[in-house]
UniProtKB/Swiss-Prot annotation:
Subunit comment: Part of a tripartite efflux system composed of MdtA, MdtB and MdtC. MdtC forms a heteromultimer with MdtB.
InterPro entries tied to this protein: AcrB_DN_DC_subdom (IPR027463), Acrflvin-R (IPR001036), Multidrug-R_MdtC (IPR023931)
Topology within the bilayer: Multi-pass membrane protein
GN (gene name): mdtC
Top-level taxon in the UniProt lineage: Bacteria
UniProt cross-references to SUPFAM superfamilies, sorted A to Z: Multidrug efflux transporter AcrB pore domain, PN1, PN2, PC1 and PC2 subdomains (SSF82693), Multidrug efflux transporter AcrB TolC docking domain, DN and DC subdomains (SSF82714), Multidrug efflux transporter AcrB transmembrane domain (SSF82866)
Main location: membrane
Protein name: Multidrug resistance protein MdtC
GO function term, MF aspect, one: xenobiotic transmembrane transporter activity
Amino acid sequence: MKFFALFIYRPVATILLSVAITLCGILGFRMLPVAPLPQVDFPVIMVSASLPGASPETMASSVATPLERSLGRIAGVSEMTSSSSLGSTRIILQFDFDRDINGAARDVQAAINAAQSLLPSGMPSRPTYRKANPSDAPIMILTLTSDTYSQGELYDFASTQLAPTISQIDGVGDVDVGGSSLPAVRVGLNPQALFNQGVSLDDVRTAISNANVRKPQGALEDGTHRWQIQTNDELKTAAEYQPLIIHYNNGGAVRLGDVATVTDSVQDVRNAGMTNAKPAILLMIRKLPEANIIQTVDSIRAKLPELQETIPAAIDLQIAQDRSPTIRASLEEVEQTLIISVALVILVVFLFLRSGRATIIPAVAVPVSLIGTFAAMYLCGFSLNNLSLMALTIATGFVVDDAIVVLENIARHLEAGMKPLQAALQGTREVGFTVLSMSLSLVAVFLPLLLMGGLPGRLLREFAVTLSVAIVISLLVSLTLTPMMCGWMLKASKPREQKRLRGFGRMLVALQQGYGKSLKWVLNHTRLVGVVLLGTIALNIWLYISIPKTFFPEQDTGVLMGGIQADQSISFQAMRGKLQDFMKIIRDDPAVDNVTGFTGGSRVNSGMMFITLKPRDERSETAQQIIDRLRVKLAKEPGANLFLMAVQDIRVGGRQSNASYQYTLLSDDLAALREWEPKIRKKLATLPELADVNSDQQDNGAEMNLVYDRDTMARLGIDVQAANSLLNNAFGQRQISTIYQPMNQYKVVMEVDPRYTQDISALEKMFVINNEGKAIPLSYFAKWQPANAPLSVNHQGLSAASTISFNLPTGKSLSDASAAIDRAMTQLGVPSTVRGSFAGTAQVFQETMNSQVILIIAAIATVYIVLGILYESYVHPLTILSTLPSAGVGALLALELFNAPFSLIALIGIMLLIGIVKKNAIMMVDFALEAQRHGNLTPQEAIFQACLLRFRPIMMTTLAALFGALPLVLSGGDGSELRQPLGITIVGGLVMSQLLTLYTTPVVYLFFDRLRLRFSRKPKQTVTE
């Protein structure tokens, strides 16, 4: 009593306290960062190593395995995967959430150093690492195009000037430059001309290397001067290499231009990048795992004018893709939904109270509670994201509940003629414990979420804390500001209501009277109600088992990512054509705004595409519908597949795959894995629950296998090293010399001119100079035949691995796909030597599925304990919790009706319903107990009176919560796929709960009261109407 009086009789202090809460919230709001979702990125580090010319199998055994053994000893590594292709190895380390990325990076460097002695001596450089996840979609893609500069020159500007500067921006983890390679002088040799002149490829290589050197020459001094010695020992352009003398034949000089075509070109001609229909260089920017995407993008944009000034005016620097606009639009949609929810909730209060003065009170209490929450969010290091703003949207219905309960009870006393200040004090005292019980039990629902580990726990923690803080502030406001405003603003007389609102008042009275009559009938047919209650419990179990489930709703971020997978023996020229064909098909779609793509590098048969869709208000289809439409058109392209998926804000794991979900096959027997992977992949491709099934196992690449006749080689005076050197010189794009420039270093690349290597007959033109100086054709001592060879070798841990990726067809859920895969594996009879398990997001889904029921049970148990402590009773908490089954049925039926799978967002809705619907029972039970203790009423009379007395606040609080969630259901635009499942769950649960709990709660109350009397051996009371 004294606590409430302190605030009611000191209005100035109470107002200033509320102003202080509001000001702190405004300051917190201004300092909060903006993000699509809470920070849930796993710390990921990528280790790269290269050994030019080495086969994938050689890279896997000699480079990947030693590094894996050393890196695998690092503490906190949750997953280690590697992929080895021609000349390169990439190892992805995913760490536990609580592992500091900088500390992990130091451990990675130490592990690389420890493995250095086990690595091949021919590696051109030590392995390097980057603190970025290569499987993440870029947060921004910049393109460089020009009608004046070549692709190599553009690449030079990008890699030398732009990429280093952008990498230094806070939040940037990696800048990957694609579409070409650095400028180089390329020497394309003519095999026939070399043969005619008696010059070997090694002779050419040695001559070029000796002609381009950079060594210190020293200095000259006399008594007073010093001269630095400088020579023309470096050749920098193709024109300078053209007249280079490489050999003398019969006294005549053989110049490089006589046996080769020398051009200013690029290091690797097997690279191509495009934006829309124009050749381009791509800068793909990824953020650090812990970085904020909006802040990072804003920092990059602020730097762009300065970057533009560092490159020539003839180069066009454009933003081809930016992830931030859809994120900002999504948050704006949530903010609008929040405002609409507040307005609707206040409208509900006005309709029920039919008083402008009374409506002002919750209209003040709600903003104070919500705005004050921002201060706590800032102190907790949270951000303004879809989940935290949804928490505040839902909180509008909660925070007004407390004010409604207090306000309605005070208004009831005023209508009975009590003076305002006395009514405020008395009314608050009567419901103070009720409000405390409702708020604390609601906060208790989220305690299990705070203790939940892994990605789901990290994802839901911000939502739970934000909502809990809003409820606690609301509790404080409802017991201080609300009664003070009631005492000083409301009048003792019955409020005059407008004529147009009288109809609503009469309707409410009629509803209350009808409810009273129906409740009397129900209390005389309690067994029927008990059967209904048991039926809802059984229906809950059946619906939960049968409803489709997924991890997280599929988002429409306005960005698609595509992976091209072509025939494993495809040439680069053909692959570049496939890239152009696919880009044209996508560019012609009316929903597409921009397309960028690239191909080449160590995997010639693959490529990547990034598609920016038009804003949501300019297209009628969702991202998934656009993918479905494009899939039909893309399937007509022969010899290659383009797999599209919508970029998501949550992507787990470091595997680069062509689809959203992964299923990994592991084996210590590589032959068994290669035997069973095609069988499993083909089986999964037939399943209607899966789409875009593909695999990263590529072991059918075309290979030309040369077999040396060592006896013949010995007789001809040729060794294996000379033969291998010949092949490397001819076909390996061998970097034979370095050109030093002030800003960068460039290579001289030697190979047989591509004009002479268009078919296998090119091998017949190759020759080796033996130890007697004679030219010996390769065909004299070697035979060759085509064979198959892997294009890549993949590991997980230290086991051979193959990852099958898949998307979900429209109308199918991840639980459908998971069950179908499990059935297929059983039907195939896969041996125990090949192990299958879900990976990435699918793995987290499996783990979440196993913990969902436990989480719900834990939440219910926590609420029971809190209520038991508050009521000092084992029985009354059970009465209150009996409201939950009907809410669960309503929520699950609503999800089924809207064809929405049960996701992590829907789970949040279920947890919220546990907190919401029990409020009705708390109000009933509190007043029933009070009537029994002080009114000398029987249990049936007490609960009947409590139900009628609390009918109006129950309807008000339920409708406030329902109208607070309704905008989430009806909202469209960016991010609606996240908001709608939450709104559907809450609205469905509230509607069903409101229909049933008004009747089931009184029946359960009487049942437990009889049970209590029976066990306490007290005389059974007679129930009367």
